[in-house]
Amino acid sequence: MTKFIFVTGGVVSSLGKGITASSLGRLLKDRGLNVTIQKFDPYLNVDPGTMSPYQHGEVFVTDDGAETDLDLGHYERFIDINLNKFSNVTAGKVYSHVLKKERRGDYLGGTVQVIPHITNEIKERLLLAGESTNADVVITEIGGTTGDIESLPFIEAIRQIRSDLGRENVMYVHCTLLPYIKAAGEMKTKPTQHSVKELRGLGIQPDLIVVRTEYEMTQDLKDKIALFCDINKESVIECRDADSLYEIPLQLSQQNMDDIVIKRLQLNAKYETQLDEWKQLLDIVNNLDGKITIGLVGKYVSLQDAYLSVVESLKHAGYPFAKDIDIRWIDSSEVTDENAAEYLADVDGILVPGGFGFRASEGKISAIKYARENNVPFFGICLGMQLATVEFSRNVLGLEGAHSAELDPATPYPIIDLLPEQKDIEDLGGTLRLGLYSCSIKEGTLAQDVYGKAEIEERHRHRYEFNNDYREQLEANGMVISGTSPDGRLVEMVEIPTNDFFIACQFHPEFLSRPNRPHPIFKSFIEASLKYQQNK
C-alpha cells in the first residue's frame, strides 16, 4: 500500500519546506523506494499560469503540460523524477472542480460545504498522485504556514486521511524555526512549541520536527523540543543553514531521518543509504575553480525566482568544467543598440530566456543583435528564439518593422504568429501549447552535435510560433532551421552556423536539467562560453 508523508510549516514562511520534502524524497529514492511528491497551494488561482512572475516566480511545466509551482522544479531536480498534473493542487483548482460538480447536479441537491465536499476533493487528488505513479511513498508539502485561514481545508483533509488509511500509512513532518536571540546569546524553542500547539489544535500530532537554525543545536535543546512537543528525541531533526542546498540531504541523512521514516511507515527499503553520487556532486560544488560570466537579458530580473530553472540549469552546466556561473542580471528595458556594449562587452555568453508581452522586448532584440554581430556565444529560449528570428529578419533580411504578432499586432512582417489552433481561443489560462513534444533534429547542425541524436523530446509553453511564410528567406540568408516538429511544420530550433555558437529553441530545456546530468544545450552553451573567455 502507498504510504503518505505530509510536510507542514510553522512560525514563518520560507523555511525551506520544499527543500526538506525533496531532500527526504531523494533519501528514500536512494533506498530503492518509488517516490512521488506533490504541493498543495492554498491560493485561489486554478494554477500559476496566468500569475505575474513578480507575484509567483517562474511557472514550472511538467511532461503532461501542467503549469505548476516552482517548487516542483526543486522536487524534480533533487529527486530526479518527472512529475505530473497531480503533483500540484491549488485551492482554486479544488473549488473549481467542486463547483462544476455542483452545477452538473452531482451532489443531488445537497448543500455543498467545505467539509465534506472540499476536503473529499483534496483527498481524492492526494490519492491520485500515488495511483498515477504506483508510488511506494507520496510526499505532500502543504503551502503556507500553520494557522493560515487559507490552508485550513488542506490541514483538515490530511488530518482525515490518517483515519481513512490507518496511522501506520500516514506520517506528519513539521518544519519550524529556532531563532537565535543575539542579545540573550541563546536559541529559543518557544516559537516551535507554539507552532506545534497550533498544529495539534487542528488535530495533527507531528511525528518528526525539522528545525531550521543558523547554529548547531545542543542535545538539551532537542530534548526540550521533544518533551514539550510530545515526540521522540531522535525525531527532532536539525536543519542548519548551508552554503549549498545540496548539503541538506546529507544533513538529514546524518541524523537518520530516512531510517526513522522507513521504520515508522514499515517500508521495505531495498538498499542501505546510498549517497556516493550526491557526495561527489557536493564535492564538485564546493571546489569550483574560476567563473564564467553569463549575461541574462530579461524582463523580470528584479525577481530572480522568475528564472529559477534557467539559473539552476546554468549552474548544473558549469559543474562538469568545475566552474561557477556568475549571472549578470540585465534588465532588457534598459538595453538599446547604442548602449548594448556597456552591458555585454565583458560577458562570456548571452542568454535571452522566455517571457510574454511587449514591454522590454526591444532590449532583448538589441542584445541578440550584439551577440550575433560580435560572435558572442548566444542561447535563446522560447521568446528568446522568436526574437532571434525577428532580429535576423530586421537586420539581415532588411524587413524593417518585422516583429512578433503577439508584441506588435500591426507589424507588416509577422515573423512570429499565433499557432493555428490558438486563433479562436480567448481565455488565457491553460490554453498554451504545453508539455512534452517531440522534435526532429536536422543532420549536420550544431543542434545534432549538442544532442547527439536525431529525435528529442522537450517541454513547451507557448502560444505563438515562427511564421513559415518567412522560412525560405531566413534559410537563404544564413539562418538554419535545425529542429522542427516531426511533421516539419513547427520550427523548434534555429542557429547561425557562421557564428561559433548561436542557437535558440522554442521549447524550455531548463525544465529537464539535473544537478548530476546537465541539459545538453546548457552544457554546450557553457562550454562555448568558456572557450570564448579563454580566447579573449
Curated annotation (Swiss-Prot):
Binding residue positions for UTP: 13, 188-193, 224
Binding site for L-glutamine: 54, 355, 383-386, 406, 463
S-adenosyl-L-methionine among keywords: no
EC numbers: 6.3.4.2
UniProt keywords, alphabetically: ATP-binding, Glutamine amidotransferase, Ligase, Magnesium, Metal-binding, Nucleotide-binding, Pyrimidine biosynthesis
Domain named Glutamine amidotransferase type-1: residues: 293-535
Cited InterPro entries: Class_I_gatase-like (IPR029062), CTP_synthase (IPR004468), CTP_synthase_N (IPR017456), GATASE (IPR017926), GATase1_CTP_Synthase (IPR033828), P-loop_NTPase (IPR027417)
Active-site residues, Swiss-Prot/TrEMBL: 382, 508, 510
Signal sequence, start to end: none
Family matches, as CDD domains: CTPS_N, GATase1_CTP_Synthase
Pathway entry: Pyrimidine metabolism; CTP biosynthesis via de novo pathway; CTP from UDP: step 2/2
Gene Ontology annotations for the cellular component aspect, listed alphabetically: cytosol
Family matches, as PANTHER family: CTP SYNTHASE, CTP SYNTHASE-RELATED
NCBIfam families xrefs: PRK05380.1, PyrG
Note: CTPSs have evolved a hybrid strategy for distinguishing between UTP and CTP. The overlapping regions of the product feedback inhibitory and substrate sites recognize a common feature in both compounds, the triphosphate moiety. To differentiate isosteric substrate and product pyrimidine rings, an additional pocket far from the expected kinase/ligase catalytic site, specifically recognizes the cytosine and ribose portions of the product inhibitor.
Its job: Catalyzes the ATP-dependent amination of UTP to CTP with either L-glutamine or ammonia as the source of nitrogen. Regulates intracellular CTP levels through interactions with the four ribonucleotide triphosphates.
UniProt subunit comment: Homotetramer.
Name the UniProt record assigns to this protein: CTP synthase
